[in-house]
Every structure is written in C-alpha cells, then in structure tokens.
C-alpha cells in the first residue's frame, strides 16, 4: 500500500465536542434512525403486506413466507451494496456516499407506501416490492459504515468513541420509533382500516422524512481527512477491500466479532424478550412490550456510555468490562426467572439492556484503519458479520428457549466469552503499547 502520513488519518485531540461536531452528529444520527425505522416497519408489517401483495388463494402461511423471504433478501444484498458503496466512498468521498445511502433508503420507502397491490396489478406487485427492498438493503449496508467513518473524520480523535456511541444509539432510536409507530397504528385503527390504506402511512412518513434529511445532509462539508488524502494524492489506487484483507485481517476479524456481539445482544435482550416474559412470567403483551421499549432506551444509553469508555479505557478494556457485566446480569436474570421477585428481575434486565450497548465500542475501531481504506474496512467489518451471523441469533434463541428456561443464557454466555477474549486480544495487540486515543 502507498505510504501516507499518519497525520492525515485523524483530527487532533481536544476537549469536548464543538457546535459543528454536534450538528454533524445530529444529521448523521437522524439518517441512521430513519433507516432503521424503515427497516423495522417492513419487518413488523410483514403479516399485513403478505395479504396485500400476494394472491388470496396462495394461503396465509405461504404468503407470509414469501414476504419474509423478500425481507431476508435484504440480508443477502446488504453486504454487496455496502462494500460497493464503501469502495466508492474511499475513492470519491465520504460526504457523497453519506448522502447517497440515505437517498437510496428514502426513495424505495416512499415508493413502498405508494405501490399498487396484487388485486390491482397482479404479479407485478410483489416484484415491485422486491425491487424496493433490494434498493433499501443496498442503502442500509452503506449507511452505517459511511456514518461511522464520516463522523470519525469530523470529530477529534479522543471523542470518536463518544460520537459513534451517540450515532449507534440513534440506530436504536430508529428501531424504537418503528416499533412504536406500528403499535400506535394497530391500537388506533381496526385491521380492516389498516388493510384498506392506513398501512401506507408509516412508509410515506419515513420516505418524506428521509428526503428531508437528504436535503439537510447536502449542506454538510466533506471530511478534512478525506480532503487531505485527496490533495496529497494518497487515495488508494487498487481495490481497498483487498488491502483491508491483506494488511488488516486481525482488525477485520476482531471487529466482526464485536459487531456479532452487538447484533446478537439486541436480538436476545430486546427482540426475543417479550415472548419469554409472556411465557415465563405470564405478562400481558402490553407489559412485555413496555419492558422491551425501556430496554431499547437503556441499550441506547449503553451505546453512549460504553462509547465514551472506549475513548477513556480503549476498546479492549471496554469490551472486557461489558462482557463481565452482561454475563453477571444475564446469570441473575435467567436463573432467577422462576424464583426472584419481579423488582430484582427488572434490575438485572436493566443492566443487561445497558450492556447490550457495550458492543458500540466498535465505533472506536474506525480510526484503526488507515484513512485511504477506512470506509471499506468498516463496511467489511459491519456487513460481513451482519450477513454471516446477523440472522442466526433469533431462530437460535427461540430454539434454546424451548429447551430450557435458561436456554438463551447459554448463547449469551458464549457471546460474552468471545467478547472478553476479543477485548483481551485487542488490548494486548493494539493498545498495550500506547494510551487509548
């Protein structure tokens, strides 16, 4: 790889975030929140969409299978889109990718809200739905790495963990907004009214807000880091992804493991929890969902807290701390489900939810990749683990919960062990010789 000056890789340390940093963070977080909002409403409304976009004689179960298949195609397309967009982002600029990814999410989301149904156009309806979903997936694969990279190159190096922790918390807020929007629709309207046209509202709303955010992002500047490497003719001329694999394999694999912990923690502690609470504690759907909503809020706080700790302690120590706290809380929660009072379980669950954000220390990893290949490095880290491992957690946890009350604890314990080992390896290999930036 071409030699480049390390001074072009990060911005100098300084105290606090400046006003411009906060503006950048706000626009980055807004885009991320909207993308995950769009992602969630499709997942949650799949049973309804299956009735509208497939023939009635197909049968409800098969229609739902096909709708979820369209949703799953997103997981396959996500790494492809993310890696292509990252390649362009390392060659053409961060700001351009940062804006394009949001535009590619907003337009198909708006289009979904305006699509004709099977009753109107026949087989064209599911084909159009599939096309929208594929474009969405390409966008979401590019958005998160582009946002992490853009923000990391706009804020001082000693604030990168906090900034990307705030950004990752924004993704959790998007999941929360998507869930609350769908719940509100189901509470306010009858099933017939939703099928008659109300289902379009969250898609149109998400699309319009996304286009507004695109317009706002247009006013952001290119990062000073990218401008510096471009002016000094340090842009990588080969295939950035190949250089990531050749020279930064350890960073890539450790980052993939941390991202797995982050995704799997959300799946186990947040997404799979309502069903477990209803089965084991006899909670109503409303009570279980309330725990879930509070859990998502705490996970967002955890992203910010552990992101800041990554600035202070380094990624390695932060990962080890998160793993120990998560395992302790999970052990109390799962083994105390049928014995402890609800107050004690709530406290253990709150700590689990907070620690589900500890994987957000991944945001600090961005500055470990050299600037000319940085976006490709983060896109590979995020998308490869999301594609290979992201869909594994929910079905595995559902199966484990059927085997034993504490079934999901086994998966969490294995994840915590992996997270702690990765933290220890990272600390010894990358952080032992120098103070965390």
Model-derived segments and spans:
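Extracytoplasmic gate region of multi-pass secondary transporters
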Residues: 43, 249-299, 390
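Extracellular/periplasmic helix-loop-helix junction of adjacent transmembrane segments
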Residues: 46-80
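Cytoplasmic membrane-interface "Motif A"-like loop-to-helix N-cap segments
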Residues: 91-102, 312-323
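C-terminal ends and interior cores of transmembrane alpha-helices
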Residues: 103-121, 325-338
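Hydrophobic core of transmembrane alpha-helices in multi-pass small-molecule transporters
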Residues: 122-141, 342-357
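Glycine-rich segments within core transmembrane alpha-helices of 12-TM secondary carriers
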Residues: 162-186, 381-393
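Multi-pass alpha-helical transporter architecture, strongest
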Residues: 213-220, 414-437
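C-terminal transmembrane helical hairpin of 12-TM major facilitator-type secondary transporters
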Residues: 316-361
